[in-house]
From Swiss-Prot:
Domain description: Has three domains with a flexible linker between the domains II and III and assumes an 'L' shape. Domain III is highly mobile and contacts RuvB.
Subcellular localization: Cytoplasm
GO molecular function, one term: four-way junction helicase activity
Organism from which the protein derives: Pelobacter propionicus (strain DSM 2379 / NBRC 103807 / OttBd1)
Main location: cytoplasm
Annotated coiled-coil segments of the chain: none
Family indicated by similarity: Belongs to the RuvA family.
Protein name from the UniProt record: Holliday junction branch migration complex subunit RuvA
A Pfam family that the UniProt record links to this protein: RuvA_N
Record GO cellular component, one term: cytoplasm
Positions of the UniProt region annotated as Domain II: 64-142
Residues covered by region (Flexible linker): 143-153
Length: 198
């Protein structure tokens, strides 16, 4: 199995990147926490989880081993597959997720698209003890990056659609936000997610 990839970023979007490793382009699914931490171009290393199904092999990449550990913990819960685990990490930062699981915050967990009350309760029940053993001291909040407003809004729409939100709902929330010309993708995405989770 592939555990680590190092290569050039050939393409970057909120839910995946194409990583060029010695002339071979790997499509690697990523959560927003990893997206925020990646440069627009250059050489990067990603911790990889390889998901093998009968019809596909998918790679999930994480900037830190802690993110990968959270991803694998989430996969250990019945009813949580790789896409849902990635979506959870896209909606809730690792430190917040550890806190939500530790405190049994069902409301925060069930606000993620695809997670109902029963799944949120199962997450808390099965992961509460395991999450307490993870070292969260390496969690770093990334610096926001600036981009043109039109591109920014389209990237936010794309990211939210990939998370399972419906386009009319996303457009309505974005219409109510005022990102301004100096807004970052991270900032607008966080504002939109907060509005959608209410």
């Amino acid at each position: 199995m592939i555990a680590l990839l190092t290569g050039q970023i050939a393409q970057k979007s909120p839910d995946h990147i194409i990583l060029d490793v010695n002339g071979v382009g790997y499509r690697v699914q990523i959560p927003f926490s990893t997206y925020y931490d990646l440069p627009e171009e250059g050489t990067v290393s990603l911790h990889i989880h390889t998901s093998v199904r009968e019809d596909a092999i998918q790679l999930y990449g994480f900037r830190t081993s802690l993110e990968k550990s959270f991803f694998q913990l989430l996969l250990s819960v019945s009813g949580v597959g790789p896409r849902l685990a990635r979506d959870i990490l896209s909606n809730i930062q690792p430190a917040q997720l550890a806190q939500a699981l530790g405190q049994g915050d069902i409301r925060m967990l069930s606000a993620v698209p695809g997670i109902g009350k029963k799944t949120a309760e199962r997450l808390v029940l099965e992961l509460k003890e395991k999450v307490g053993k993870l070292d969260l001291s390496s969690v770093v909040v990334p610096e926001p990056r600036q981009m043109p407003e039109d591109d920014l809004l389209e990237d936010v729409v794309s990211a939210l659609l990939n998370l399972g939100y419906k386009e009319p709902q996303v457009r309505k929330v974005l219409a109510g936000l005022n990102p301004g010309s100096d807004a970052s993708l991270e900032g607008v995405l966080k504002q939109a997610l907060k509005s959608l989770m209410r």
